[in-house]
Design a protein with these regions (language model features):
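Alpha/beta-hydrolase-fold enzymes
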Residues: 175-264
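Short alpha-helix in the alpha/beta-hydrolase fold that links the catalytic acid
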Residues: 287, 301-310
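An N-terminal hydrophobic leader/cap segment in hydrolases
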Residues: 21, 27-70, 75-84, 234-240
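The serine-hydrolase catalytic nucleophile loop
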Residues: 102-114
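Conserved alpha/beta-hydrolase
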Residues: 116-136
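Catalytic nucleophile-loop/oxyanion-hole region of alpha/beta-hydrolase
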Residues: 105-108, 133-168, 336-340
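Catalytic active-site module of serine/aspartate enzymes centered on a nucleophile-bearing elbow/loop
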Residues: 323-359
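Short beta-strand/loop motif that positions the catalytic acidic residue
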Residues: 285, 291-293, 297
Length: 359
C-alpha cells in the first residue's frame, strides 16, 4: 500500500471540539458543522489514499526530501502521482512539477488535479513549500521566496535525474503564489530545463485593487524589520473570495494543514518584493506557457495575467479567460467549470509532449 506513516499519522479531531478526549462518548445527533472532520478531502470513502488513487486511475506516494544545502539541510514533505498499473517499462508522457499557493499544501484538494493528470498519463511531483503543510519553517512565514525556489529546484532536479525519467519533457505547474514561484524558477534556470509552464490564476503582481495604500506599506516595512512573523496584515477571507460553491468552502476550511490566521508581515513584504520583481521582468519570460484565469477573480488580478501574456517574450504563449470564474478554478467552481479548465490544461500539455513510440 502507498499509505506511508506520514500520511496515516494524522487522525484529526473535529475542529469544533479540539480539546475533546478521543474516548468521550459521541453525541447522538450531529449537525454537518459538528461532524468529525474527514481525514481526507473527498470524505469518508474510500477510507485510504491508495484506494482513492486506484479508484481514479492513479498511484501515489509521499515521503520527505532533504535539501543538499550547505547552510543546513531542510526537510520538505513531498508527494508523487503516477498513472496506475505502470509496470517497470511503462513511461509517463512527461513530468509535471507542481507548486501550490499561499496558505495551502499538497495533501488536501490540491491532490485532485495531480490525480487527474496522473490518470491522463503524466507523472506529477509536488512539495509543501517552506512554512506550509508538513515542510520546515514557521507556518505561513515565507521571509525569502529564494529559499522556496532553491528547495523546490533541488527536489525537482533530483526527480529529473532518475534514470527512468531520462529524456522526458518537464513542465512546471503553479497555482496563485505557486505560479509566481514557477516564473521565478524559470528566470533563475536555463530555458532548456523546461518544456513549458501552466499558470493557474498566477500572482504575478499584487493587484492595485488589493495592494495596501500609502502610508500602510511604509509602516509595514518598518514594523516587519522588528517583527516579521507578526500575523497582523488585514485581509479578506480568502476561502470566501476564492471558492464559489458553498459546500466546497466547508471542505477547504476543514483542511487540517491550512493556515487560517492573518498573513504575517514578513510574508506580505516578501510577496510584494517578489511580485514587483516579476512585474518588472515580464518581458524576460521566454518559457512556453498557458495562463488560465477567472474573469471574476478578486484574489489575483486577471488584468495582470493579460499583461503577462502581452509582455512575455515567449513565442509559444496562450491565455484563457473564463467568464465569471473565481480564484479557485480547479476546486472551488461547479464541476462542469472544473472540467473545462482541466480539459484545456490537458490539451495544452498533450500538444507539447512527444508522441509515445507506440503511436
Amino acid at each position: 500500500s502507498n499509505d506511508s506513516p506520514t500520511t496515516r499519522r494524522h487522525q484529526f479531531p473535529s475542529p469544533s471540539h479540539p480539546s475533546e478526549s478521543p474516548h468521550a462518548p459521541a453525541p447522538l445527533t450531529m449537525t454537518q458543522e459538528e461532524a468529525p472532520a474527514p481525514v481526507n478531502f473527498w470524505g469518508e470513502h474510500p477510507a485510504t489514499e491508495s484506494e482513492y488513487y486506484a479508484a481514479h486511475g492513479a498511484e501515489g506516494e509521499s515521503s520527505y526530501f532533504t535539501t543538499p544545502d550547505d547552510a543546513g539541510a531542510r526537510r520538505l514533505f513531498t508527494r508523487s502521482w503516477r498513472p496506475a498499473g505502470g509496470g517497470a517499462g511503462a513511461r509517463p508522457r512527461a513530468l509535471v512539477f507542481m507548486v501550490h499557493g499561499y496558505g495551502n499544501d499538497i495533501s488536501w484538494t490540491f491532490q485532485a488535479t495531480a490525480v487527474f493528470l496522473a490518470r491522463s498519463g503524466f507523472a506529477c511531483f509536488a512539495a509543501d513549500l517552506p512554512g506550509h503543510g508538513r515542510s520546515h519553517g514557521l507556518q505561513a512565514f515565507v521571509p525569502d521566496l529564494e529559499v522556496a525556489v532553491a528547495d523546490l529546484l533541488a527536489f525537482f532536479r533530483s526527480v529529473r535525474r532518475r534514470e527512468e525519467h531520462a529524456g522526458l519533457p518537464c513542465f512546471l505547474f503553479g497555482e496563485s503564489m505557486g505560479g509566481a514561484i514557477c516564473l521565478l524558477i524559470h528566470l533563475r534556470t536555463s530555458p532548456e530545463e523546461w518544456a513549458g509552464a501552466v499558470l493557474v490564476a498566477p500572482m504575478c503582481r499584487i493587484s492595485d485593487r488589493i495592494r495596501p495604500r500609502w502610508p500602510v506599506p511604509e509602516i509595514l516595512t518598518l514594523v516587519s524589520r522588528f517583527a516579521p512573523t507578526l500575523p497582523i496584515v488585514p485581509t479578506a477571507d480568502l476561502i470566501e473570495k476564492s471558492v464559489k460553491v458553498p459546500a466546497k468552502r466547508l471542505i477547504a476550511a476543514r483542511n487540517p494543514m491550512r493556515y487560517n490566521g492573518r498573513p504575517r508581515l514578513g510574508t506580505v513584504m516578501e510577496l510584494l518584493r517578489a511580485t514587483d520583481e516579476l512585474g518588472a521582468r515580464l518581458g524576460e519570460i521566454t518559457i512556453p506557457f498557458l495562463v488560465v484565469h477567472g474573469s471574476a477573480d478578486e484574489v489575483t488580478d486577471p488584468a495582470v495575467s493579460r499583461a503577462l501574456h502581452e509582455a512575455a517574450a515567449s513565442e509559444d504563449k496562450t491565455i484563457k479567460m473564463y467568464d465569471g470564474m473565481l480564484h479557485s478554478m480547479l476546486f472551488g467552481e461547479p464541476e462542469e467549470n472544473i472540467e473545462r479548465v482541466r480539459g484545456d490544461i490537458l490539451a495544452w500539455l498533450s500538444e507539447r509532449c512527444t508522441p509515445t513510440s507506440t503511436s
